[in-house]
């Protein structure tokens, strides 16, 4: 396969599909699996048939025991690549069109209780240089339901603190307005006082959250911050920044928020994505059985 096609595909993902750098890298990494298979079998991805692709799927998924989510991600990348080839007239027909996506098991997300989030907040050492920053990060993730990529990419020029909202650049460069909670606003204001004392590196001035060297935080840094706080707070769950987003949505729903409002706050295109938060907790199920089952009402 010619390098010119790969460069054109990269441009297509970046500009026409408006994908983030991380998403582009993921698509290209999965395409590399197809290229490796083709090299091993003397094939060219551009001229592959449906039967060739089926063999690739079997070889990659069945024999390696790849889980369903990984299968779906790789197939999505394959579909995207062949749509690009068809759209740009490199091929006359899409051989991936009949490849079926695996059925996805919908996982119930890990959610922290209000008490667990409070424990994480209390585990923050505010005497450390990064303490107030970390407190503001927790409040932003939990109080506004931001994705970790949205948090690290948050810019001061998109924050309207006097009006209590911020402009968020979501997936596919889609923008949405998100309210800033009073607590998040207060803690962010305190972080801004600390931020003034940093030596901010050129080109980093507009990023809301910086490390001690004045550079934009990375997603990996946020993961590390949260997991250390979780460990310090004695929380046994395996969490990520997305856990706070899940907790934000779940707690809103439990307290009566409309699902459509939650959908808008999270930036979900399809409400079926938001509907996963309608799951009932194990505690709620147990409470319902204890309250309503006749065997428990005899006592």
Each PLM stretch: what is its role?
Residues 1-299:
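Conserved catalytic core of the tyrosine transesterase superfamily
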């Amino acid at each position: 396969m010619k390098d010119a096609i790969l460069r054109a595909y990269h441009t297509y993902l970046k500009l026409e599909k408006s994908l983030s750098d991380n998403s582009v890298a993921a698509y290209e990494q999965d395409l590399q699996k197809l290229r490796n298979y083709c090299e091993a079998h003397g094939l060219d991805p551009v001229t592959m048939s449906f039967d060739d692709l089926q063999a690739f799927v079997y070889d990659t998924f069945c024999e390696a025991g790849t889980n369903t989510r990984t299968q779906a991600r790789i197939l999505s990348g394959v579909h995207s690549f062949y749509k690009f080839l068809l759209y740009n007239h490199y091929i006359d027909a899409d051989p991936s069109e009949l490849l079926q996506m695996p059925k996805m098991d919908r996982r119930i997300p890990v959610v922290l209780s209000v008490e667990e989030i409070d424990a994480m907040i209390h585990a923050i050492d505010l005497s450390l240089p990064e303490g107030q920053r970390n407190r503001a990060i927790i409040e932003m993730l939990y109080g506004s339901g931001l994705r970790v990529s949205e948090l690290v990419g948050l810019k001061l020029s998109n924050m309207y603190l006097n009006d209590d909202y911020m402009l968020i650049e979501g997936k596919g460069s889609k923008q949405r307005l998100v309210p800033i909670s009073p607590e998040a606003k207060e803690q962010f204001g305190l972080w801004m006082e600390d931020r003034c004392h940093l030596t901010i590196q050129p080109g980093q001035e507009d990023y809301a959250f910086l490390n001690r060297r004045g550079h934009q935080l990375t997603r990996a840094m946020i993961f590390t911050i949260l997991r250390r706080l979780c460990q310090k707070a004695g929380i046994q769950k395996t969490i990520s920044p997305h856990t706070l987003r899940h907790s934000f949505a779940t707690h809103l729903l439990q307290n009566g928020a409309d699902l459509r409002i939650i959908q808008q706050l999270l930036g979900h295109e399809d409400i079926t994505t938001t509907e996963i938060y309608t799951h009932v907790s194990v505690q709620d199920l147990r409470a319902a059985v204890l309250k309503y089952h006749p065997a428990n009402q005899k006592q």
